[in-house]
């Protein structure tokens, strides 16, 4: 019977090692999300909403759609496996959008498959601010509950309650996998 020490010595002679002492070529991948990552993702989402509105004002539907496609591809995880997206102003039977096309239609309208979509991002938004109520970070996922205040060019403010859940994709980018939004309850 060979002892553990004898086996280790034999493996060492052969150029092999056992246990935790082997540290050559150690690879550590840390995809942990930080609070700052979440806050930056929310700022970017708000900025993109305003930018799509501006693109619509200056370049029409075509410009807004082109920008919205880029935003969806960079912010959401449709290409990385899927998204649960429940936008603010949707109605049955198309309340939840699990496809990129459904999200695009919600933001800019114009898709006959979604005839009730008017283009939420085309409403003349001039500012957007996410105020966090809570953030939970669990390594490679993070969830936030926020009040998002969106102002249009007339100065009217719409407040929505948002839940965003993020993952880190294979390229190390933060992506939205859950986006639930509803109008703030006013008690009336």
For every predicted segment, state its role.
Residues 10-12, 22:
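Cleavable N-terminal signal peptides
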Residues 1-10:
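Bacterial N-terminal signal peptides that target proteins for export
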Residues 59-132:
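A solvent-exposed, acidic/Ser-Thr-rich amphipathic alpha-helical stretch
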Residues 23-75:
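Short, low-complexity N-terminal intrinsically disordered segments enriched in polar/charged residues
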Residues 137-145, 154-187:
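Short beta-strand edge/turn micro-motifs at domain boundaries
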């Amino acid at each position: 019977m060979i002892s553990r020490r004898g086996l280790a010595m034999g493996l060492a002679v052969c150029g092999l090692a056992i246990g935790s002492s082997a540290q050559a070529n150690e690879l550590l991948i840390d995809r942990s999300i930080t609070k700052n990552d979440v806050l930056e993702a929310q700022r970017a989402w708000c900025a993109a909403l305003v930018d799509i509105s501006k693109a619509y004002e200056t370049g029409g539907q075509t410009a807004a759609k082109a920008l919205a496609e880029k935003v969806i591809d960079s912010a959401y995880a449709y290409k990385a496996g899927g998204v649960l997206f429940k936008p603010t102003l949707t109605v049955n039977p198309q309340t939840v959008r699990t496809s990129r096309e459904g999200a695009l239609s919600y933001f800019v309208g114009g898709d006959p498959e979604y005839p009730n979509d008017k283009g939420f991002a085309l409403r003349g938004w001039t500012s957007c601010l996410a105020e966090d109520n809570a953030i939970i970070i669990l390594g490679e996922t993070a969830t936030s509950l926020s009040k998002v205040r969106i102002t249009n060019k007339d100065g009217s403010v719409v407040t929505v309650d948002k839940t965003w859940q993020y993952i880190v994709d294979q390229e190390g980018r933060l992506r939205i996998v859950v986006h639930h939004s509803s109008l703030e309850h006013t008690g009336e």
